[in-house]
Amino acid sequence: MMTLKEAENAIVEEFSMYEEWLDKYEYLIELGKSLKDYPEAAKTDDRLIKGCQSRVWLDHEVKDGKVFFNADSDAIITKGIISLLIGLYSGRTAREILSSDFSVVEKIGLKENLSPTRANGLVSMIAKIREIAQCNI
């Protein structure tokens, strides 16, 4: 597994291949399609991330000291965003997650190219991932 920095750099490099934001959105949509199936029974209110315009469910499990995330959303771009985040942070220790400054979203221009409500949702997703990591130190 790549280090977190290596994974972040790979994402920055991947996004830099696309000049137009429309192409970057298409890439996010494809990322969202790569999420593993999320059971309907798991789409409960306690797994909903508050602060997102779209519904985003996030759960996790800890195995061998590493936090593994699973997520889904009812909106395709939002699903891609959460897929990007869990692709980076799933399978890492809580300390690794908390050591991240999550600047990758700024480096790829994601936050500034989202609508204000989606940008708020992104902040909420990051906060929830950090909260889960904090609870599993």
Q: For the regions a protein language model found, what residue spans apply to each?
A:
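Short conserved catalytic/interaction loops centered on acidic-Pro-aromatic/His motifs
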Residues: 94-100
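N-terminal intrinsically disordered, cationic/polar leader segments
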Residues: 4-55, 62-63, 92, 105-124, ...
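A short interface-forming secondary-structure element
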Residues: 73-74
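Short Cys/His-based metal-binding microdomains
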Residues: 78
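Alpha-helical support elements that line or immediately flank enzyme active sites
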Residues: 81-92
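Hydrophobic residues embedded in beta-strands of well-ordered beta-sheets
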Residues: 65-67
